[in-house]
Amino acid sequence: MNLQHHFLIAMPALQDPLFRRSVVYICEHNPDGAMGLIINKPLENLQIEGILEKLKITPEPRDPAIRLDKPVMLGGPLAEDRGFILHTPPSRFASSIRISDNTVVTTSRDVLETIGTPKQPADVLVALGYASWEKGQLEQEILDNAWLTAPADLNILFKTPIADRWRDAAKLIGVDILTMPGVAGHA
């Protein structure tokens, strides 16, 4: 099972404060483990504009149609000072990894320098930190009913309101997660 370019959708019984009702976009999954970004936990009082200001990046030429007040996500509990930018192609940046035909993750400053300009990728999600699982850990958590999985959907990743992403990601596989009981069993 390879879950790269899939969503992990937290089951209602998952009560860890960070992962409760979370949707994680899996950027990498291989025999050694997995890495992903939480896409529905905005950091309080931090927007893309604030990141650009902190890094002394001024978008030029500025495209006024591009909003810089979008929230920055808490991507996960590891390396919370490190930025990850999920975006649609192209991946012409210094440190980009193509996740799927339609999704790229970049960690280099050059992608931030395009945000707010006509050169910005069409869709962008900025996160600080990431989530990681060791070999076999994610598979075991899925067997333990901590997560549902669904193929990633770009609309949910980039366009769905943050508050709706958990519910809408579960709907991708026909699940109304709001009506699920808090404890799941094995059949």
From Swiss-Prot:
TM stretches of this protein? none
InterPro entries listed in its UniProt record = AlgH-like (IPR003774)
Q: Could you give one GO CC term from the UniProt record?
A: cytosol
- Record Pfam families: DUF179
UniProt lists the family membership as follows: Belongs to the UPF0301 (AlgH) family.
Protein name per its UniProtKB record: UPF0301 protein YqgE
Traced from the root, the source organism's taxonomic lineage reads: Bacteria, Pseudomonadati, Pseudomonadota, Gammaproteobacteria, Enterobacterales
